């Protein structure tokens, strides 16, 4: 493995067998080296293989200016997230989370901590991601000796949601607001007190996450068969009426008209949450 470029003493780039650029990280990898020299395999700690040349360039920039210990800490957090969340996280997370952690630590050392305006929503809508965010604060404290405020757990959680949805951070924040607006409509329309540990609640939140993404992306879901919609409308009257209230709100604030398919699935999820809470109350 030959060095193509030396970014700093700890980070170099190489070309793989398909002539794709890879970023290789390890303490002392680039020290007293020149392009064309062989990489010392014993020093390699991490190899980043990003298929996009743009991502590779952005990652190279991040790794060139951020201390190795911060990079390896962010990598540990991402490994934990992959283990806990399952599924794929976008490669761009290596860039965004490393960059975020670096600046959060720098700001904290300067006494400038930022309040997370979506902290309340993140705690309730992204419980798994927020729990990982709290673990991440412990990892940062243990490895770097810096105790970041709890608001940073919320920011880290949003980065994880971003990596799952393959969206940009501003869009993730808009998605979160849409989700909270809908949950509030259901809560007050049906006079519910959510059980945030219930399976039906988690399924509803997951549905809302992807629904909000489609809404903001203007990608509606249609169905040629409307017979099930009519059954749901007739059978789940309260839930369907609540879904219509949501439709009115979305039309007013987002200029988006729900399809019958979207109305139907909202009603189904609302009914699941409502009926489960009703059963628990009866017990």
Swiss-Prot record:
Post-translational modification: Phosphorylated and inactivated by ArbF (EII-Bgl). The degree of phosphorylation is dependent on the presence or absence of beta-glucosides which act as inducers of the operon expression. Addition of inducer result in the rapid dephosphorylation of ArbG.
Domain of life of the organism encoding this protein: Bacteria
Claim: Oxidoreductase is one of the keywords in the record: no
GO molecular function ontology, one term from the record: RNA binding
Domain PRD: 65-170, 171-280
PANTHER family in the cross-refs: CRYPTIC BETA-GLUCOSIDE BGL OPERON ANTITERMINATOR
Function (record text): Mediates the positive regulation of the beta-glucoside (arb) operon by functioning as a transcriptional antiterminator. This is an RNA-binding protein that recognizes a specific sequence located just upstream of two termination sites within the operon.
Protein name: Beta-glucoside operon antiterminator
Organism of this sequence: Dickeya chrysanthemi (Pectobacterium chrysanthemi)
């Amino acid at each position: 493995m030959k060095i193509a470029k030396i970014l700093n003493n700890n980070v170099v780039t190489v070309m793989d067998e398909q002539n794709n650029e890879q970023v290789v990280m390890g303490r002392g990898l680039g020290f007293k080296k020149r392009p064309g020299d062989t990489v010392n395999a014993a020093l390699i700690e991490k190899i980043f293989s990003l298929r996009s040349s743009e991502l590779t360039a952005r990652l190279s920039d991040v790794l060139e200016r951020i201390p190795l210990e911060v990079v390896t800490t962010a990598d540990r957090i991402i490994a934990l997230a992959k283990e806990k969340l399952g599924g794929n996280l976008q490669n761009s997370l290596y860039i965004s989370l490393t960059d975020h952690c670096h600046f959060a630590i720098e700001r904290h050392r300067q006494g400038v901590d930022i309040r997370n305006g979506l902290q309340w929503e993140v705690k309730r809508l992204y419980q798994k991601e927020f729990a990982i965010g709290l673990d991440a604060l412990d990892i940062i404290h243990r490895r770097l000796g810096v105790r970041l405020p709890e608001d940073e757990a919320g920011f880290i959680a949003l980065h994880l949601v971003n990596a799952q949805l393959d969206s940009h951070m501003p869009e993730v924040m808009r998605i979160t607001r849409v989700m909270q607006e809908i949950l509030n409509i259901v809560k007050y329309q049906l006079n519910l007190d959510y059980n945030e540990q219930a399976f039906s609640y988690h399924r509803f939140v997951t549905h809302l996450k992807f629904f909000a993404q489609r809404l903001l992306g203007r990608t509606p879901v249609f169905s040629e068969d409307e017979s099930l919609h009519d059954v749901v409308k007739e059978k789940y009257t309260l839930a369907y009426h609540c879904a219509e209230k949501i439709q009115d709100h979305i039309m007013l604030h987002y200029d988006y008209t729900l399809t019958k398919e979207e109305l139907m699935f909202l009603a189904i999820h609302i009914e699941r949450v409502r009926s489960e809470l009703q059963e628990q109350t009866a017990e």
